[in-house]
Amino acid sequence: MASEIYRRLPMELPAQHLLASLALVGALLSVGYLLLRPAKYQLPLPPGPRGLPIIGNLHQAPKEKAWEVYKQWSDRYGPIMSVNNGGMITIIVSSHEVVKNFLEKNNAVFSSRPQLLVLERALYGFTTPALPYGEKWLKHRALRGAVLKPAMAVRYRGLQDLESKQLLRDLLYSEDFTQCMRRQAASLFLGIAYGNRFPEETPEIIDIDQAVAQLGGISESMFQGTGMLREFFPVLKYFPGYDKFLKQLDDVGERLANIYVRRFRDGLSTPAWNWAKEYSKRPEAQGMGELELSFCIGSTYQASLTPYEILRIILLAAICHPEEKARLQKEIDLVVGKDNLPGWEHKDRIQFVQAFIYEALRWHAFSPLGAPRAVSRDIEYKGYFIPKGATLVLNQWAMDHDENVYDNPFTFRPQRWIDNPDLPHVIFGFGLRGCPGQHLARDHLFINTARLFWAFNFGNAYENGKKVELDLDELMQPRGGGSAFNQVPSFKASVIIRSSERRQIVENEWDAVEKDEQKILAEAMPLPE
């Protein structure tokens, strides 16, 4: 659904209006940069592909699979390189070593965001992940940290357990595993955030999904074609066609605002504990209005769907690598047995589950370029100048396919993570901008991966008695705009319970589990500080 919406969004400005502004603004930016650059920083920028006068490397901007193009460039120019987008510098990092020895050690320098004018307008300047480093972002971060810290993730396990058991039972009666898993992820977030879970897909879930998909289309448009130029050259707002674009932004922003505020008010009135109530009473919320608090919570929804996307990657990896899937099930059965569902007590005992998750994400990165960061002050690295205001991009796909770190990086081999537990990964980012919900996400991925493969065999689907082969080339093609996210499109699979005994256990566990969200969320309420 999301990818279809992306393709229907007309986000491009007329190309004939770009050249004049590019020539003028690009020249001014380039000359100004050279004239105002401090004398003490007469060091070269990191190397990169040679550009053209004025526009730099804009004509070389990849139209799809940017991470692979950047990997080819990094093989030539090194693990840290620069590109010039008409006077605006982007630093691209393709090495775990640079992340560890430079970025993490200078965390404060790389913890801001570029000023994204499009998102700022569409989201009223209240969407936490897009905020630059500053007082507002620190308050938002403190609010999220209060409900997403490790101790809180443990307290959400009651709701995780319920949603996981419903997913298993739903799969006994439905062939649409994608819809079942998406409902689960949405219901988990809506339950924690607003105090009401959704046992079935409802118009409320569809409405927020469609609005978030529209936002995703706008986000993708900023990193490709003339969409990139809107961010780099705000002067384009004076050209014909911009009013139509602004109308689209305002429509999406208004739609999201209505959804988020409505859900926020519902959360305040529901009997169960939830984030809306918790945020409202915390000292960090002093001075925040209803709209800002609503966006602070609501903007987490898109991130909450990431584990759902990752589970689909895990299922695809298992179907494409049946020998590794068989070992995964063997390891789960060895630790858990056939008479009980995997539980939290098994988390540290089934090492192969975590290894399989890490390898699936290395094999097919969901966010291969991560979210862009902004450099907050001039800094030097190994004789290269990294200027304040530059955009920082982490090529996570290149890092995950680095031959110097991973032996045979294009081979799917979960055992590598057991042989070397210290292998690096950037699944959840790093530093102050690391994913605040990673502990909740890790629990979600473990309990669902372990239980799904304990209960079911996943394999190729059959139609009219013929096996449906998966076209990996097609499935690996980027979706969305191909810049920030690499969602796996819908694919067919067979979902077969492993035995009648396991089917009965799934049914019994569902019948016995506590389903009253008010009781479950009472256990999630934070302890007094």
UniProtKB/Swiss-Prot annotation:
Location(s) in or outside the cell: Membrane
Which key words are in the record? Heme, Iron, Membrane, Metal-binding, Monooxygenase, Oxidoreductase, Transmembrane, Transmembrane helix
Residue ranges of the TM segments: 13-35
Q: Where's it mainly located?
A: membrane
GO CC list: membrane
An example molecular function term from Gene Ontology annotations:
oxidoreductase activity, acting on paired donors, with incorporation or reduction of molecular oxygen
State the annotated membrane topology for this chain. Single-pass membrane protein
- Asked if the record carries the keyword Iron-sulfur, the reply is no
Which protein is depicted?
Answer: Cytochrome P450 monooxygenase okaD
Taken from the UniProt record, the cysteine pairs bridged by disulfide bonds within this chain are: none
**Protein family (similarity comment):** Belongs to the cytochrome P450 family.
The catalytic activity, as recorded, is: okaramine C + 2 reduced [NADPH--hemoprotein reductase] + 2 O2 = okaramine A + 2 oxidized [NADPH--hemoprotein reductase] + 4 H2O + 2 H(+)
